[in-house]
Amino acid sequence: MVLLEKLWDDVVAGPQPDRGLGRLRKITTQPINIRDIGEGSSSKVVMHRSLTMPAAVSPGTPTTPTTPTTPRKDNVWRSVFNPGSNLATRAIGSNIFDKPTHPNSPSVYDCVDNEAQRKEHVALCLVGAWIK
């Protein structure tokens, strides 16, 4: 038993100190005897332990638990492929594309009229789109 205690001290607590603190290493305590305390005094100490649990109210029929839902997010692809369907940006599209910022700047409709005009206005369309 002594060998086991020494091994325990060496592994867990480390090696014994050279001097001084060796006696503080192991603390032995005696359990308190309640009967000894009660005998010396005129009143007896009585201890009770009790455990109570509240009654659970169960529903009449079992129900399937519902999963919490997250709020619906806007579909990004819907707003990309159908620009007019996004209610938050519906007015922005008409303001940007239908009303040019400069009197001589081409609109979107000027860029796609026909093949001949498209070739003439390619540079203007690119510059106009780049500025916006």
From Swiss-Prot:
Isoform 1: Expressed mainly in the low bolt. Isoform 2: Expressed mainly in the low bolt. Detected in flowers. Isoform 4: Expressed mainly in the low bolt. Isoform 5: Expressed mainly in the 6 days old seedlings. Detected in 16 days old seedlings, axil, low bolt and floral samples, but only barely in leaves and top bolt. PANTHER family: DORMANCY-ASSOCIATED PROTEIN 1. Disruption phenotype: No visible phenotype. Drm1 and drmh1 double mutants have no visible phenotype. The modification Phosphothreonine is found at residue 64. Predicted to be an intrinsically disordered protein. Induction: Circadian-regulation. Down-regulated in axillary buds within 24 hours after decapitation and then up-regulated. Down-regulated by the transcription factor ERF114. Down-regulated by cold. Almost complete down-regulation by sucrose, fructose and glucose, but not by other sugars. Up-regulated by heat and dark growth conditions. Isoform 2: Up-regulated by salt. Isoform 4: Up-regulated by salt. Isoform 1: Not up-regulated by salt. Isoform 5: Not up-regulated by salt. Pfam families: Auxin_repressed. Residues 53-76 are annotated as: Disordered. Belongs to the DRM1/ARP family. GO terms for biological process: response to fructose; response to glucose; response to sucrose. It comes from the Eukaryota. The keyword Phosphoprotein applies. Coiled coil: none annotated. It comes from Arabidopsis thaliana (Mouse-ear cress). Residues 61-70 have a biased composition (Low complexity). Keywords: Developmental protein, Phosphoprotein. This is Dormancy-associated protein 1.
